[in-house]
Amino acid sequence: MQAALAAIWKKNLHQTRDRLTLLQRAADHLSTTRTLEEDLRGEAVSTAHKMAGSLGMFGLHSATEAARAVEQSLDHNGLPQPERLQEQVDALTAILAPHLSD
């Protein structure tokens, strides 16, 4: 079972990296402009939701919680606090960093 999960993880590694990049882009945009366009925000919410739902399957429960925190920050009325969103995205990235190499 572990070998099968490892193969799936490796196959989808690029997608995980792309998802982190999108979340970082949203956090950077919010920090720089203090705005977040609805299309970018919607894409970031969807991405964080997908990550929260899938990372636990690989035993990355702390990453699941971090992705859920990002999703909740983005998916409430009003803009998230830029510093808080950046901290949450950084935390998710740090948790996943050891698992992102080929």
What positions do the PLM features span?
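A structural signal for long alpha-helical coiled-coils and helix-turn connectors
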Residues: 24-31, 52, 59, 71, ...
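Residue-level signal for short amphipathic helical patches enriched in basic/charged
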Residues: 11, 15, 58-61, 77-80
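Sequence/structural signature of long amphipathic alpha-helices
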Residues: 69, 80-83
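Long, amphipathic alpha-helical coiled-coil segments characteristic
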Residues: 1-45, 83-100
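Extended, amphipathic alpha-helices with heptad-repeat/coiled-coil or helix-bundle character
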Residues: 38-76
